[in-house]
């Protein structure tokens, strides 16, 4: 019954067309984690733990535009609680040509967050702790997603007055008054869609700014 219901959900979500009549059925889907993807995740984005397991996660396929107007197919793993929300969001982003450069599994970067951020890769699930702490990240539960991270860095002023910037190569895009490609701004389409679907934006935090980051609190 569970697999049947999931198949119905995939059919319903993917049977939606754009306002121009383009069928999106081949580009957007939700699945339980396929065996080949699960194997790829082992020792990388997935580590043995008591918090989250395979049945809690979903594998998503989406389409997206880049800044040059080219269409790409992307994939990600997320918590099943936000799978439908992410499909709705990415369908609308695609309809309105909102640019996202890459959407690849973090496993392709050996779950190295710095590497994938430098490559401007958008991703969701990765079982890891918050940088510099022992606290589990919302990414560890598949409840957070980072969008175009190179151009939307994490920035925090430390006690000694220096700035911690992640990725380290993102200094040119820390000035949020400037306009540049792949930038997330308060009130733009990406920001609006995530907030409408119950996510919190890291760019609104007070003591630190995580402009790439949206997280969902169940």
Enumerate the predicted regions with their spans:
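Bacterial Sec-dependent signal peptides at the C-terminal "C-region" and cleavage site
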Residues: 13-24
């Amino acid at each position: 019954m569970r697999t049947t219901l999931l198949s119905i959900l995939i059919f319903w979500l993917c049977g939606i067309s754009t306002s121009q009549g383009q069928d999106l059925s081949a580009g957007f889907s939700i699945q339980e984690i396929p065996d080949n993807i699960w194997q790829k995740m082992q020792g990388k984005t997935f580590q043995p733990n008591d918090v989250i397991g395979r049945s809690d996660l979903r594998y998503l396929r989406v389409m997206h535009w880049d800044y040059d107007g080219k269409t790409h197919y992307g994939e990600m793993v997320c918590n099943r609680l936000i799978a439908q929300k992410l499909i709705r969001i990415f369908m609308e982003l695609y309809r309105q040509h909102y640019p996202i450069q890459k959407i690849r599994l973090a496993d392709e970067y050996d779950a190295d967050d710095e590497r994938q951020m430098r490559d401007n890769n958008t991703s969701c699930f990765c079982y890891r702790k918050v940088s510099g702490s022992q606290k589990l990240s919302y990414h560890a539960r598949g409840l957070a997603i980072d969008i175009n991270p190179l151009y939307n860095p994490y920035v925090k002023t430390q006690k000694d007055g220096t700035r911690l910037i992640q990725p380290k190569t993102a200094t040119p895009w820390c000035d949020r008054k400037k306009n540049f490609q792949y930038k997330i701004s308060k009130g733009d389409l990406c920001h609006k869609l995530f907030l409408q679907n119950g996510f919190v934006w890291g760019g609104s935090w007070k003591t630190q700014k995580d402009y790439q980051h949206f997280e969902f609190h169940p």
